Amino acid sequence: MSAEKSQNVQDVFLNFIRKNKTPVTIFLVNGVKLQGIVTWFDNFSVLLRRDGHTQLVYKHAISTVMPSTPISLFEPPIKENGEE
């Protein structure tokens, strides 16, 4: 087994948007839309900050996390003119 700890896509995604302070829209399973910046997360919850207020959102209530800008986690970014 590798000494390197493998990460799941959820952790890689959330850590990327946290580090880059990417604004996100989070849709809950009941249809509620939350917007803000992810400041922290663990296996069960996400902290979302907006306008100086922090919300604790349980992951089991989240349907979708949508960043405000496109992100590229595992693929090289595509340049504006179509070149790689």
Swiss-Prot record:
Keyword vocabulary terms for this entry: RNA-binding, Stress response
GO molecular-function terms, A-Z: RNA binding
Domain Sm, chain residue ranges per copy: 11-71
A GO cellular component entry from the record: cytosol
One GO biological process term: regulation of translation, ncRNA-mediated
Domain of life: Bacteria
The protein's assembly and partners: Homohexamer.
Family statement: Belongs to the Hfq family.
Function field: RNA chaperone that binds small regulatory RNA (sRNAs) and mRNAs to facilitate mRNA translational regulation in response to envelope stress, environmental stress and changes in metabolite concentrations. Also binds with high specificity to tRNAs.
Protein name as annotated: RNA-binding protein Hfq
Source organism per UniProt: Paramagnetospirillum magneticum (strain ATCC 700264 / AMB-1)
